[in-house]
């Protein structure tokens, strides 16, 4: 299977965004954010950034984190532009990744089934 350029750019973006969130972004709304995946379109114009929150998160915390990420989008693109030497930097859109919550729910159900046996 071929490793497309969009996949390489997505991996690079994920690493750099994680570093930005850890070291440069000071907004408390995004302090618990973890970047789980990034999907970049083949034309490298758009990137969907999937994130989750460490620990149990309420709906309000999820909305607050999404708002914080969207408010810092311009700063992140500026910093990513300095770090990455790409002709065009994709437009970023942030999406909450609920797959970890779903996996946790399935795991709890399986444990409950084994407990009842």
Curated annotation (Swiss-Prot):
Family annotation (Gene3D superfamilies): 3.30.300.20
Function in brief: One of several proteins that assist in the late maturation steps of the functional core of the 30S ribosomal subunit. Associates with free 30S ribosomal subunits (but not with 30S subunits that are part of 70S ribosomes or polysomes). Required for efficient processing of 16S rRNA. May interact with the 5'-terminal helix region of 16S rRNA.
GO biological process, one term: maturation of SSU-rRNA
The family this protein is said to belong to: Belongs to the RbfA family.
Superkingdom of the organism of origin: Bacteria
Cellular compartments annotated: Cytoplasm
Main localisation: cytoplasm
Gene: rbfA
Entry GO CC: cytosol
Subunit structure, as described in the record: Monomer. Binds 30S ribosomal subunits, but not 50S ribosomal subunits or 70S ribosomes.
UniProt entry tagged with the keyword Cytoplasm: yes
A molecular function (GO) term: ribosomal small subunit binding
Name of the protein: Ribosome-binding factor A
Cytoplasm keyword on record: yes
Keywords: Cytoplasm, Ribosome biogenesis
């Amino acid at each position: 299977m071929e490793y497309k350029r969009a996949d390489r750019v997505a991996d690079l973006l994920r690493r750099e965004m994680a570093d930005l969130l850890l070291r440069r972004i000071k907004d408390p709304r995004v302090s618990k954010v973890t970047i789980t995946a990034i999907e970049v379109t083949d034309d490298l114009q758009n990137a969907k950034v999937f994130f989750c929150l460490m620990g149990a998160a309420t709906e309000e915390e999820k909305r607050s984190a999404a708002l914080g990420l969207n408010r810092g989008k311009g700063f992140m693109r500026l910093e990513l532009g300095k770090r990455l030497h790409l002709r065009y930097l994709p437009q970023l859109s942030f999406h909450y990744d609920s797959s970890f919550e779903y996996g946790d729910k399935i795991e709890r159900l399986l444990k409950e089934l084994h407990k009842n046996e």
